[in-house]
């Protein structure tokens, strides 16, 4: 996912002559594990990788491996995750169970960084002994459905809480009045040189289609609005537009989305490519990049599409304008199937518009590796650099 990719990019830039870094994962799984720099000391995970599997797969495997208590934890967490409430309520209920099954580190640290909302922040605050505690939230706190009443006690014990855009910082200020001084913006770090090198590989779309290609990179979840994308694709197909829409990613709604695509008659029009460790050749080869999310923080996939100078369409989620200046370097459209369809139809029909957006994006340098200095300042208890 985007957060994991952001973390790996951050770790790849760290000054290991200056810092010793331990990496604590909840479970050893993920597409980017092999990209963690060798200088990082990878601690044993809090749970086996199987813990993250679907409960029907996880339970028998954990029991066979001799982890009855972890199997019990996984079962209880499943029930907690299915109860009513917004995401923040569920994360908190899950942590109230998991905290009894996870160990605390033996040593004390100069600083701990919890790189994600929910359990990582709860763990860092509750279990880790450190002189400075820093949290990250990679989205719009309110739009994500997090619960300020539940999180307030944890936020109070952080020395800094970072997020990825000014809009996201404003959401934190609204959720936690009076906490402005500890809320900081550290943008997702982009290395354009690395991306362009990776993009030189071939893009295997798995077909011989020669028409316009639309690409989306997203977790297959409700947040990403892919159900809206499929309805938009149906409208465009009915109107006679020739295109293929490729989706890179996996997630909890994969089966439902594939069934929806089949029922809408889109089995050949929409192609699910699954997980791809290197999405950059696909970005280079696509004609349009579309992000149809219901909410985002500052989408890493959109940042990457900007670096690759692809014409971009975004739905009007709360932070969309933090990334795209609509009509100047992309389109921001209503968060409806009709809005998405009309925007994509404009891009498909107007080559000059696509070229204008590509030229505007190509004129900018999105590399921002200097953002890491902001984190260094927080780690060392120094004043946060002015932007």
Regions found by a protein language model. Name each.
Residues 4-9, 212-235, 241, 252-258:
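A conserved mid-protein helix/loop that constitutes part of the nucleotide-sugar donor-binding site
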Residues 275, 294:
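Aromatic "clamp/platform" in nucleotide-sugar-dependent glycosyltransferases that forms part
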Residues 289-290:
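A short hydrophobic beta-strand element within the catalytic core of glycosyltransferases
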Residues 304, 317-327, 331-332:
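Short acidic/histidine- and often glycine-rich active-site loop of Leloir-type glycosyltransferases
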């Amino acid at each position: 996912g985007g957060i994991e990719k952001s973390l790996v990019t951050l770790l790849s830039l760290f000054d290991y002559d200056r810092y010793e870094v331990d990496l604590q994962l909840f479970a050893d799984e993920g597409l980017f594990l092999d990209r963690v720099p060798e200088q990082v000391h990878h601690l044993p995970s809090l749970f086996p990788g199987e813990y993250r599997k679907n409960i029907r797969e996880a339970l028998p495997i954990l029991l066979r491996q001799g982890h009855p208590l972890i199997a019990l934890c996984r079962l209880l967490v499943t029930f907690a995750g299915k109860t009513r409430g917004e995401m923040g309520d569920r994360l908190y209920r899950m942590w109230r169970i998991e905290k009894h099954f996870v160990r605390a580190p033996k040593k004390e640290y100069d600083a701990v960084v919890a790189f994600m909302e929910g359990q990582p922040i709860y763990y860092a605050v509750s279990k880790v002994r450190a002189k400075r505690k820093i949290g990250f939230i990679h989205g719009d706190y309110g739009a994500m459905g997090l619960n300020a009443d539940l999180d307030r006690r944890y936020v109070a014990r952080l020395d800094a809480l970072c997020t990825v855009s000014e809009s996201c910082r404003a959401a934190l200020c609204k959720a936690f009045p009076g906490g402005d001084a500890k809320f900081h913006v550290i943008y997702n770090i982009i290395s354009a040189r690395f991306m362009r090198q990776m993009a030189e590989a071939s893009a295997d779309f798995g077909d011989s289609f020669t028409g316009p290609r639309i690409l989306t990179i997203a977790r297959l979840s409700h947040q990403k609005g892919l159900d809206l994308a499929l309805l938009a694709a149906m409208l465009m197909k009915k109107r006679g537009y020739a295109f293929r829409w490729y989706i890179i990613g996996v997630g909890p709604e994969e089966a439902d989305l594939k069934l929806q695509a089949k029922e809408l008659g889109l089995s050949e029009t929409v192609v699910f490519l699954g997980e791809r460790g290197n999405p950059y050749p696909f970005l280079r080869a696509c004609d349009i990049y579309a992000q149809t999310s219901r909410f985002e923080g500052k989408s890493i996939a959109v940042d990457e599409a900007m670096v690759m100078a692809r014409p971009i369409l975004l739905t009007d989620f709360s932070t969309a304008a933090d990334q795209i200046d609509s009509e100047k370097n992309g389109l921001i459209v209503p968060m409806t199937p009709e809005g998405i369809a009309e925007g994509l139809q404009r891009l498909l029909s107007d080559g000059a518009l696509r070229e204008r957006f590509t030229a505007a994006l190509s004129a900018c340098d999105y590399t921002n590796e200097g953002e890491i200095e902001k984190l260094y300042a927080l780690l060392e208890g120094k004043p946060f650099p002015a932007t």
